[in-house]
Amino acid sequence: IFKDKSKLKDVPEEGELVRWMQQQGQIYNTFGLYQTKEYGLLSEWKKIGERKEGGQCRPFNKMTVEGNVITKEGVDEQGKALAVREKAWYKYVINKNYKQIPQIYSFEPFAMQKINGKNIYQYDLQLEQQKEVIDKLVKCLKELHTFGKAPADYFSIYEAYLGKTFKRLEKIRDLVPFANEKYIVVNGRKCRNVFFYKDELIKKFENYKCNEFVFLHGDNTFSNMMLDDETMSPVLIDPRGYFGYTEMYGDVVYDWAKLYYSIVGNYDQFNLKRFRLQINENDVMLDIESNHWEAVEDYYLDLIKDEVDKNTIKLIHAIIWLSLTTYAWEDYDSICGAFYNGLYYLEEVL
């Protein structure tokens, strides 16, 4: 728009930009911003997000709602590939007579029941009510995990936890402030930078124990689980359908860590851009709005203690945050925030 930045050198710090431009005696070429909307105030933009909440989808998906029917469609190669896996997952659990999913009306087009309820993070529940919901979530996930077993595949474990993460991190190294510093201070915590401590992270997996794979959901955050308003029963949506190089099956810890991601990590608020990132001269401050489920952390971990220990959950949780970096490619603050949050949690277990 401006080929010579000197044209803007005298822009005042306050006031209306357009009015100032009118006073400069310059001639500008204009073009129409068709199919766009001016919001003016941040509060108006937030209202749009609130109306969309619960109906948001990733940039690679398109979702339409007609009455009580939701139709999903992949809009690019990534979205189409994920749709194939999602459909296969639903077909599998339908054959197992699994009840904690929406009714599927057709696979071509991919149409399903619109649940009369909300995503779990949208509910304002008391502590005892939250515990009841956690009980139900753990129960329905454990049922899901009984639908099949497969030999553990080391290459899939490495790819899901390390290979994929390192590949994504390399793409953003030149984008993130302090990425070339050995330590980064995040929320007052001096954190080892994974770019300099990659070997230490790899060593954490040298003795990683996973004897067998189970059938997974793979993306069971609060954003992908709803509660039926009438029965308060969980409804699982948007399954991932793969783990590393393995279709359908994977490390059971991954599902438990994804739930922890919402309970403690407040991923769902981060995903809605409800966070404040402040990059200072020598440190970083990241404040993510809370889902208000942190109080059930110990209760949740106690329910799954026979399948995974606390430190392992924390390790995988940190890796999931680091992996989010390029998955949030459409928003620079989200890229940086996911990286810094991953380092913050990784420091607890590295």
Regions found by a protein language model. Give the residues of each.
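Conserved kinase catalytic-core helix
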Residues: Y92-Y98, I120-Y183, V194-K209, L216, ...
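Helix-rich C-terminal or lid/interface subdomains of diverse kinases
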Residues: G25, L41, E132-K136, K167-F178, ...
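Active-site Asp-x-Gly
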Residues: D229-M285
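ATP-binding glycine-rich loop module of kinase domains
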Residues: Q56-A88, Q113, I120-Q126
